[in-house]
Amino acid sequence: MSDVSLKLSAKDIYEKDFEKTMARGYRREEVDAFLDDIITDYQKMADMNNEVVKLSEENHKLKKELEELRLRVATSRPQDNKNFSSNNSSSASNNVDILKRISNLEKAVFGK
C-alpha cells in the first residue's frame, strides 16, 4: 500500500504568513476563513490515512491467520481409520469450529 504523503501539514498552513504589499490585495478575513477550511480538510485526510494504514495491517494479519487455519484444516486429516473412528466426534467438532472461524475471517477480510 503506498503512503499518501502530504506536502503541507495543517500546522504549516496555519503558520503561513504572506507578504503584505501596498497594492490592493485579498481580504484578510476571507483568506483566513479559506485556510481554516483547508486545515480542517488536511486534518481529516491525515486521520483517514492513519485509518487506512491501520486497516491494511489488520487485513494482512487476518489473511495470514486465514491461510494458517486453512493449512491446519488441510493437514488435520486422519492418519488411519482406527484413529479416525475413535476420535471422529472430537475431530468433527474441532473441524466444524475451525471452519466456522475460517468463515468468520473470510467475512471480516472479504466482506462477504
Curated annotation (Swiss-Prot):
Q: Which InterPro entries match?
A: Cell_cycle_GpsB, DivIVA_domain, DivIVA_fam
> Which portions of the chain have biased composition (kind: Low complexity)?
81-95
Q: Where in the cell is it found?
A: Cytoplasm
Q: What GO terms in the biological process aspect are recorded for it? A: cell division; regulation of cell shape
**Transport in keyword set:** no
Chain coiled-coil ranges:
42-77
Entry annotated with the keyword Cytoplasm: yes
Pfam families associated with the record: DivIVA
Q: GO terms for CC?
A: cytoplasm
* Region Disordered, annotated ranges: 74-96
Tell me which UniProt keywords the record has, alphabetically.
Cell cycle, Cell division, Cell shape, Coiled coil, Cytoplasm
**What coarse category fits the chief subcellular location reported for this protein?**
cytoplasm
Subunit structure, as described in the record: Forms polymers through the coiled coil domains. Interacts with PBP1, MreC and EzrA.
NCBIfam families associated with the record? DivI1A_domain, PRK14127.1
Biological function: Divisome component that associates with the complex late in its assembly, after the Z-ring is formed, and is dependent on DivIC and PBP2B for its recruitment to the divisome. Together with EzrA, is a key component of the system that regulates PBP1 localization during cell cycle progression. Its main role could be the removal of PBP1 from the cell pole after pole maturation is completed. Also contributes to the recruitment of PBP1 to the division complex. Not essential for septum formation.
- Would you identify the family this protein belongs to, as annotated? Belongs to the GpsB family.
Please identify the protein, giving its name as recorded: Cell cycle protein GpsB
* Gene that encodes it: gpsB
